[in-house]
């Protein structure tokens, strides 16, 4: 999210690990679920104005380029707005024009969301355990699967999914997980290595 305070620091950290993917998490606004209903926290551009949406996407890509000195390896969006029409078509057009993968757009890539520390909004620590991740690895289908995860180490993050992020880091880096990947002959790849969707 290039408009966030820590963007420059995150990109600087990325330079230490050049093999990692560095995607652009496009931010068009945020909604929060409170007291049984969704409420808008902020909006970058009107969600029903596709010309404004495209212009904002391009602005954020340009800001990413200025900060990183290169294109992102892939695109996605905050709160998955790129999965919903009519925005999906705009995101797809921009990604296609730039030759960048767009998350959840390539039919040859399946998605696994089972590695998550919440279940129906409540804490679910078993979801981010070493045992669960090893089970997921054993049950992966042939082909390419994206594992949805939210690892992080910022204890001061303003999020209701904060402690779980450091647990995810510990689990993802655990030696038993590495051994399971090797045993199941799973090769980790970055978004930069994925085929583009037509």
Language-model-detected regions and their locations in the chain:
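Terminal accessory/targeting
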Residues: 2-21, 27, 32-68, 74, ...
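Active-site histidine-anchored catalytic micro-motif
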Residues: 79
């Amino acid at each position: 999210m290039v408009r966030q305070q820590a963007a420059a620091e995150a990109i600087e950290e990325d330079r230490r690990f050049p093999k990692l993917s560095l995607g652009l998490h496009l931010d068009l606004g945020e909604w929060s679920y409170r007291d049984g209903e969704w409420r808008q926290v902020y909006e970058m551009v009107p969600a029903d104005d596709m010309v404004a949406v495209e212009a904002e996407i391009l602005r954020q890509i340009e800001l990413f380029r200025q900060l990183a000195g290169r294109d992102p390896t892939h695109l996605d969006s905050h709160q998955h707005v790129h999965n919903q029409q009519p925005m999906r078509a705009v995101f797809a057009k921009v990604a296609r024009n730039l030759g960048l993968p767009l998350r959840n757009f390539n039919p040859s890539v399946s998605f696994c969301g089972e590695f998550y520390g919440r279940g129906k909004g409540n804490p679910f620590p078993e979801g981010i355990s070493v045992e669960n991740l090893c089970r997921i690895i054993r049950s992966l289908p042939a082909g390419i699967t994206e594992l949805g995860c939210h690892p992080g180490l910022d204890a001061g993050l303003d999020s209701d999914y904060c402690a779980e992020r450091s647990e995810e880091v510990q689990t993802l880096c655990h030696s038993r997980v590495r051994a399971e990947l090797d045993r199941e002959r799973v090769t980790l790849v970055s978004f930069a290595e994925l085929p583009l969707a037509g």
